[in-house]
């Protein structure tokens, strides 16, 4: 696969994942403005950190992806769904880590774009 096709896959999956995260945000956070509240509540119940809770939830999605591979599933839509879930748990975990560390990731972005990614894509076009 050449770089152009690979970059298309990246954009495709990031778009799908972003749409799911935004749609499910309201479902999981409800009226609470804290998007990560479910992980924090589970942490309170289990005595684990919110990050460890997210990682434990992610394990279910890793198993699901392994199951697809073991069964030889070729349905692209099913792969998109399962890999998207896994990617989203990586993003949710990163959000928890950013919050725990008091990071300001908004300062690292420019108008919603990640400079490193934008630069890499621009360099690929040269």
Question: For the regions a protein language model found, what residue spans apply to each?
Answer:
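Intrinsically disordered, low-complexity regulatory regions
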Residues: 1-126
């Amino acid at each position: 696969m050449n770089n152009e096709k690979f970059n298309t896959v990246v954009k495709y999956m990031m778009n799908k994942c972003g749409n799911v995260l935004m749609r499910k945000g309201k479902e999981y956070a409800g009226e609470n403005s804290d998007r990560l509240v479910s992980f924090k509540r589970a942490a309170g119940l289990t005595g684990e950190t919110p990050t460890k809770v997210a990682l434990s939830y992610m394990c279910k999605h890793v198993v699901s992806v392994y199951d697809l591979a073991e069964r030889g599933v070729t349905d692209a839509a099913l792969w998109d769904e399962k890999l998207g879930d896994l990617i989203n748990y990586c993003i949710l975990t990163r959000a928890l880590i950013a919050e725990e560390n008091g990071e300001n990731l908004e300062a690292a972005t420019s108008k919603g774009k990640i400079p490193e990614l934008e630069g890499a894509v621009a360099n690929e076009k040269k």
